[in-house]
């Protein structure tokens, strides 16, 4: 199977500079406030929560303070070091695991009531088969009725700027040629890292992917341009600046 972590993503993971500057860089990102509000609505009752690709721990601190039993997994030792300092500063408790989220079966994590995979972490996994296997693995780590929340980028939002339209045109040409991962988006040079790319979804595609993983979609929110609220109205599938999703492991399933 194709390696789920591309060299560019691995360089991002391994960068201490990225980790140490992460919270400052994203301080004014409105999605970081809005997604927390949405998660609080979806996950009202404290329980066991697994944060996949937890980064510097913004959700770990928040949910630990709410009384959740939280576990964070990230491959970056530098991100986890920042998360550990933030948890200590807030006198919050969490289990931190340095590991590959695409290999959950080998981490001995147990079962959870909730799992979150935020800020396009799902799109950072390369390969359709790898993304499906990852979601199926999450399902295996949820108790029956357990919830998964995630954020992904919207492919069609690329229509609104020139570089995005060029990406779409190139992607469709790759698709016609039968190339694998035709809609993988090159973001080379992002934060000074060469070779970064990520997968961007359509609403219908994310619905199909969740169904194939055995997860029932509870809610799909279309994000407005500033990603600080829900987009409504006509053609929102084309206009949305990404999606927040909540899916459930059906009751009565192992």
Residue ranges of each PLM-predicted region?
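Conserved class I S-adenosyl-L-methionine
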Residues: 1-53, 58, 62
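Class I SAM-dependent methyltransferase SAM/SAH-binding core
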Residues: 58-103
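A short acidic, Gly/Pro-enriched loop at the edge of an enzyme's catalytic core
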Residues: 106-114
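A short SAM/SAH-binding and catalytic strip from SAM-dependent methyltransferases
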Residues: 114-129
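A short glycine-rich, Lys/Arg-flanked "PGG" loop and its adjoining helix->strand segment in the class I
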Residues: 132-144
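SAM-dependent methyltransferase
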Residues: 149-209, 219-226
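Core SAM-dependent methyltransferase catalytic element
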Residues: 232-254
């Amino acid at each position: 199977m194709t390696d789920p972590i591309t060299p560019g993503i691995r360089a991002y993971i391994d960068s201490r500079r990225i980790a140490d500057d992460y919270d400052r860089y994203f301080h004014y990102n409105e999605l970081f406030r809005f997604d927390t509000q949405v998660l609080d609505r979806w996950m009202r009752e404290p329980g066991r929560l697994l944060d996949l690709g937890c980064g510097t721990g913004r959700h770990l601190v928040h949910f630990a303070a709410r009384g959740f039993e939280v576990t964070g997994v990230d491959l970056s030792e530098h991100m986890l070091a920042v998360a550990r300092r933030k948890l200590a500063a807030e006198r919050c408790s969490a289990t931190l695991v340095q590991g590959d989220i695409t290999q959950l079966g080998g981490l001995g994590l147990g079962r959870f009531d909730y799992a979150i995979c935020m800020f396009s972490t799902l799109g950072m996994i390369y390969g359709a088969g790898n993304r499906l296997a990852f979601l199926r693995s999450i399902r295996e780590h949820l108790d029956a009725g357990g919830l998964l929340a995630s954020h992904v980028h919207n492919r069609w939002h690329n229509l609104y700027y020139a570089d995005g339209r060029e990406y779409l045109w190139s992607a469709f040409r790759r698709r016609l040629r039968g190339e694998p991962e035709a809609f993988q988006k090159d973001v080379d040079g992002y934060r000074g890292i060469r070779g970064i790319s990520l997968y961007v979804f359509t609403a219908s595609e994310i619905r199909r992917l969740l169904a194939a993983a055995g997860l029932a979609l509870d809610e799909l929110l279309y994000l407005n341009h500033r990603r600080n609220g829900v987009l409504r109205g006509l053609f929102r599938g084309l206009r949305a600046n990404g999606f927040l999703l909540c899916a459930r492991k059906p009751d009565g399933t192992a």
